[in-house]
A protein has these predicted regions:
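Long, contiguous internal "core" modules enriched in hydrophobic/ aromatic residues
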Residues: 3-6, 10-187
Length: 188
């Protein structure tokens, strides 16, 4: 697991240095373009591995019953896709992404938002919890003293409003980058 995290960090740092050096003219931009796709593929695999490894680390926290869910690895992969694509859409305010990348990120972000909402609700209401303590904690979150944070924050501001902004962006080409950046900020 540690090697996955170190590999992901290394690939990310190399990519950042390479793109920065090309942007500043220290290296040929053709070199950056030539290694961009291999770095993307390797980085994506390592990012997904990092999300799954993080879920397994959470699962080892025996005192945290809410983290003892079989959905956790898939949920963290979905959230990694959601947050990663959202951050890249927000970066699109400052750096041109190109139409193909922009469209792909839009779809990944929108689909990940919907799937994450489904998994969140399924995990809270559709599956038995690991223990009675976890069931009571989940009830406190969804119906008890934390219900406003859950429903207004996690569900409303973290999922529904970003989904509405994604839908609005799909019908508003000129304002799409700003709407998607706002949606991304809300999900992070």
């Amino acid at each position: 697991g540690a090697f996955i995290l170190m590999g992901f960090s290394t690939v990310g740092e190399l990519w950042l240095l390479l793109e920065g050096a090309a942007y500043l003219g220290f290296i040929d931009s053709g070199l950056a373009a030539a290694v961009r796709i291999p770095l993307l593929v390797i980085g994506f695999v390592l990012a997904m591995g990092s999300a799954v490894y993080t879920a397994f680390l959470f699962g080892q926290a025996e005192g945290r019953d809410l983290w003892q869910s079989s959905l956790l690895p898939a949920h963290l992969v979905i959230q990694a896709l959601m947050v990663g694509s959202g951050v890249l859409l927000a970066v699109g305010l400052f750096v041109p992404l190109g139409a193909t990348l922009f469209t792909a990120l839009l779809w990944i972000f929108g689909v990940a938002l919907v799937v994450d909402l489904f998994v969140t609700l399924l995990g809270e209401f559709g599956m038995p919890h690991a223990s009675e303590v976890a069931a009571r904690a989940a009830h406190d979150i969804s119906h008890g003293k934390y219900k406003n944070h859950f429903w207004a924050g996690a569900i409303g501001l973290g999922h529904i409003l970003p989904l509405l902004l994604v839908i609005a962006a799909a019908f508003s080409a000129g304002a799409a980058p700003l709407l998607l950046a706002a949606a991304a900020v809300l999900t992070v």
